[in-house]
Each structure stands twice: as C-alpha cells, then as structure tokens.
Amino acid sequence: LLNQDIDYTVHGELSVNLLDQEHFESHKEILKRDIEVSGEIKASHLVTHFGQTINNVHENKELYASHLMKQQECYAKMGEYAKSNNVTLAIENLFPFTHNHYAPLPSEIAKQINEINHPNVKCCLDFSHAYINCTHRNAHFINEIKMMGPLSEHIHMHDSFGTIERIWTYIDAE
C-alpha cells in the first residue's frame, strides 16, 4: 500500500475500553501499540472506541466522572504520542452492547474531545451506533450527530434498525 497514492485508516481493537478501570493499563498499552503500528504503516488515522461501562458505574456520578477524567487524560497523552507517530486518533462512538451497559452519546463524546482540544484527537462518527444509542436512550439523533460531526475526520455508515438485543447475531457486538 505504501506505493499507492491513497490515505488509509487502521481500525483498532473493539476491546480497548478506557473506562474499564480494572484493566485500564492493558487497554492503554494496546492503544499505544495500535498507534505505533499505524504510524509504522503510514496510516493517517487510527479508529479507537470511546469507553463504555455498566449502568451501575454511570449512575454513581462521582465515580463515573473520575473514570471519564482518567480516560480524558489518557487520550490527551495518547494524542501527543499519536502526533509523534504522524497519526490522528479517530475516537468512535459505540452503543450499549446489552441493556446493562452504558455507552456515552455522541454529544458526551464531543464534550470530552472538545475539552481535550488536541489536533491529533478527533472523532469517528458511526451513524448506526449513534442511532442505536439514541433510540435506546430516547435522545434526538440529529441533534446528537450535529455535536460530534464537526469533530469527525472519519465516518462509518451501515444499516441499523436502532435497537439492541432483538434478534440473534453472530457475535454480541454485532
């Protein structure tokens, strides 16, 4: 690919979750290695997922805020590391994989990315994930994507009915 006149993106592991405090250091190390690989193969962007957690953690506002702050500090540091590797992080929105999980809405992600305010920390707006999450949380889809859209340097578009756990899927995340 290096002899082609194209830009390309690496999609990092779905499992990286910087809101998972129990395995935070492992998630951070995987993200760091993804940045290194992306830089080595000259990818312009690395898509990685904004963290998600369980409802009980989200409902404890003080605990959730501390998890968000730790993730934000990590993204700021990883933004510098990405910059040194000529890579931009494209942080993708998710949806809750089950009814017991909490995935932040696009507006919540946009708020954190704006607070980080780093040229190498941007967004990947996944329209279907946003639709599923907005439907699940009864949030206004268009208003939500308007918040994240201007920060997005990469997008994902695919079909979705906007629901979770209604039919069998090949893997849970599907």
Regions found by a protein language model. Name each.
Residues 9-15, 43-45:
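Long, hydrophobic/aromatic-enriched structural stretches that serve as scaffold segments
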Residues 82-173:
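Acidic/histidine-rich catalytic cores of soluble enzymes
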